[in-house]
């Protein structure tokens, strides 16, 4: 395929003026060989494994960034779900493994380490429960470690016991970091249909079907897409808008493919996937909500928002799929409220509500992300919100998730500051009519008929 000089110039302009970057180069590592009978031995093996395997990740990524002029924002590590390592270890508190991961992450210089995780969509094993019980202490004691728990799949339905357990865990995480605006909750995601090759945090894990070591790359570029849409004629129809987004997504993805292949080659590991997700940052203009407003919605959250987001998501996937044969991960537009300046503005103006975000989740990637809510929100209400997110994922055979942050001492209208890529956000209201009966019923929500694909 011939690349014209003007296309190269366009890509350079995207980088220099519109915040185009590679959001993350994530090294996935298998920790299966680290399992042992003693918690301290597991922690030692985990530290040694990560520092040995990931020692060159940051220097290699930085060298690629310099040589090609492509900003790489984060270098990250994902590991085997830690619950899989502790079955033969009797320790009730397994947070020492998280602390070892955090120390190893600091040693090799990465920004985040994901994989303090468990998959409990059909039932909660003894090791899974110990890991989940350790999440609040683990996230409170670490800076880089992220946790995730899968509670539902289209094939299995929703584990309602796990949903309520995770709601209580979210509350416990908030309490454990109440002096830091519940920051532990920003590092915890509850999933439906979790994927094995997600390079983005906080939900990255290294799945059981992955090789021992693999590079997965997550692209970014909302600012570049917004600029392209804004450059169109005001009279351009939606087909033209979709075509322009598709062409831009292709260019962004080719950049991600280049970085992924080169990083894998230099590190001597497998090239896994390029995640086609558009990931916003708090920087002005680097916003998914700004794209929706450029398409024509007066304010993100207004009527037409879900349609515009569906158009955006579809066009990005189509363009990205032309740019790489290794598309994977979550691959869709992200809508994390605190990380998107235009979304924060929409919440402050009353245009964007939790219920509208739920509708948007049905057509994009993940969904209820980085949402700050009142600290006194009951666990049963949080369980209801998580359950709604899971129901959308189960029914539509897609990955959905909730990253909810009940901030102690804060109420609707207050502001919370997380810093860095996590941004800041106003506290959003939550419908108070959940009650307690539904959340406490327990059991499993049966899988839909659509889950029987064979």
Model-derived features: positions:
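Anaerobic metallocofactor- and corrinoid-dependent redox/one-carbon enzyme cores
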Residues: 1-454
């Amino acid at each position: 395929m011939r690349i014209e000089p003007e296309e190269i110039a366009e890509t350079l302009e995207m980088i220099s003026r519109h915040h185009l970057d590679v959001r993350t180069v994530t090294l996935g590592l298998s920790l299966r060989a680290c399992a042992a009978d003693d918690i301290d031995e597991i922690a030692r093996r985990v530290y040694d494994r990560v520092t040995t395997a990931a020692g060159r990740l940051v220097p290699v990524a930085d060298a690629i960034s310099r040589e090609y002029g492509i900003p790489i924002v984060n270098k990250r590590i994902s590991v085997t779900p830690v619950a899989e390592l502790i079955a033969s270890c009797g320790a009730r508190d397994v947070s020492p493994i998280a602390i070892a991961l955090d120390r190893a992450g600091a040693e090799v210089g990465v920004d985040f380490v994901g994989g303090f995780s468990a998959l409990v969509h059909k039932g909660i094993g003894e090791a899974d429960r110990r890991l989940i019980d350790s999440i609040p202490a683990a996230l409170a004691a670490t800076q880089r470690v992220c946790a995730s728990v899968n509670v539902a799949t289209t094939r299995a339905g929703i584990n309602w016991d796990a949903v309520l357990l995770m709601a209580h865990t979210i509350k416990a995480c908030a309490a454990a970091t109440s002096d830091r605006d519940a920051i532990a909750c920003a590092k915890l995601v509850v999933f439906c249909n979790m994927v094995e090759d997600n390079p983005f945090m906080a939900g990255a894990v290294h799945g059981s079907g992955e090789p021992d070591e693999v590079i997965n790359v997550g692209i970014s570029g909302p600012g570049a897409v917004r600029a392209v849409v804004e450059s169109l004629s005001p009279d351009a129809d939606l087909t033209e808008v979709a075509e322009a987004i598709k062409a831009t997504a292709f260019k962004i993805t080719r950049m991600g493919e280049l970085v992924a292949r080169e990083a894998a080659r230099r590190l001597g590991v497998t090239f896994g996937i390029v995640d086609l997700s558009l990931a916003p940052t708090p920087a002005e203009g680097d916003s998914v909500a700004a794209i929706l407003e450029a398409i024509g919605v007066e304010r993100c959250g207004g009527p037409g928002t879900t349609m515009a987001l569906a158009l955006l998501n579809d066009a990005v996937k189509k363009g990205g799929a032309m740019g790489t044969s290794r598309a994977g991960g979550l691959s869709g537009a992200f809508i994390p409220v605190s990380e998107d300046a235009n979304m924060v503005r929409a919440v402050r103006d009353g245009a964007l509500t939790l219920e509208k975000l739920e509708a948007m989740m049905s057509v994009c990637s993940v969904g209820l992300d980085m949402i700050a809510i009142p600290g006194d929100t009951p666990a049963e209400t949080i369980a209801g919100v998580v359950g709604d997110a899971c129901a959308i994922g189960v029914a539509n055979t897609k990955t959905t998730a909730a990253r909810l942050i009940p901030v102690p001492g804060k109420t609707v209208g207050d502001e919370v500051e997380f810093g860095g890529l996590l941004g800041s956000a106003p506290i959003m209201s939550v419908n108070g009519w959940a009650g307690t009966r539904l959340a406490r019923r327990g059991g499993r929500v049966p899988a839909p008929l659509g889950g029987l694909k064979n």
